Structures are given as C-alpha cells and as structure tokens.
Regions:
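Small cysteine-rich, disulfide-bonded extracellular modules of the LU/uPAR three-finger superfamily
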Residues: 1-73, 80-115
Length: 115
C-alpha cells in the first residue's frame, strides 16, 4: 500500500475522507513497488472497479479486454480522484489481443496493518 493509501484508509476510518476506490489499472513494468509510488510505472489500461467487503476483507475486482497483446507486470488501485493507493508487481502475464483479463485485489485489515 502506498503512503497516500494508508493516509486515505486512516481518513476513512475517522470519517474525514470521503473518497472511494474507483478504478484498477494494469501496466507492463516490473519495478518493485514503493510507498511513494503515485502512478503505475508503465500503464496499459485502467477500468472501473467493483468493490465488496465483509468485516476485515475488501475485495476489488476489474475486467480488462485489450485490443492488442501485452505482458502485464503491475496492478494498481486508484481512488475516484486518481490517487494510487496500492501497486503490486505480478509474474509476467501475457494477455493476447481480445483475451479477457480479470483482476482481483484483496485488502485484509487487522490490528497489525493492512495486507
């Protein structure tokens, strides 16, 4: 999770931040994520997210259908104002033109943090 993501989560917990998770993005760069990330390194596409939650788990899902072939290496979750709250690196995932790609990101919230 990014620093901005942790700040957003703290603000949501106190009711001071009303922004919502809105989009999932995918990209082609495999550079390790950092807390200071503000964007995907090499964004391919971004689409609307579906968010569901139960007690301590938040599931974020999105579906992509790309017009050309890409190797997907990174995934990011964005708020409705475009703020990146988390970025993750994947094993190389080759997606052919017209092939669907479904992405799910799961946040687990516990006393020890967000995972």
């Amino acid at each position: 999770m990014t620093s901005a993501g942790r700040a957003w989560l703290a603000g949501r917990a106190t009711g001071e931040d009303t922004r919502s998770i809105a989009q999932v993005g995918i990209g082609s760069d495999g550079t390790e994520p950092t807390e200071s990330d503000t964007a995907l390194v090499s964004e391919i596409a971004r689409t609307a997210a579906t968010v569901s939650s139960s007690s301590d788990v938040v599931d974020i899902t999105a579906s992509f259908n790309l017009a050309q072939e890409y190797t997907v290496r990174e995934v990011g979750v964005f708020l409705d104002d475009g703020t990146l709250i988390g970025r993750w690196v994947l094993a190389d995932t080759l997606i052919g033109a017209g092939e669907p790609l479904d992405v799910t990101v799961e946040f687990r919230v516990s006393d020890g943090g967000v995972y």
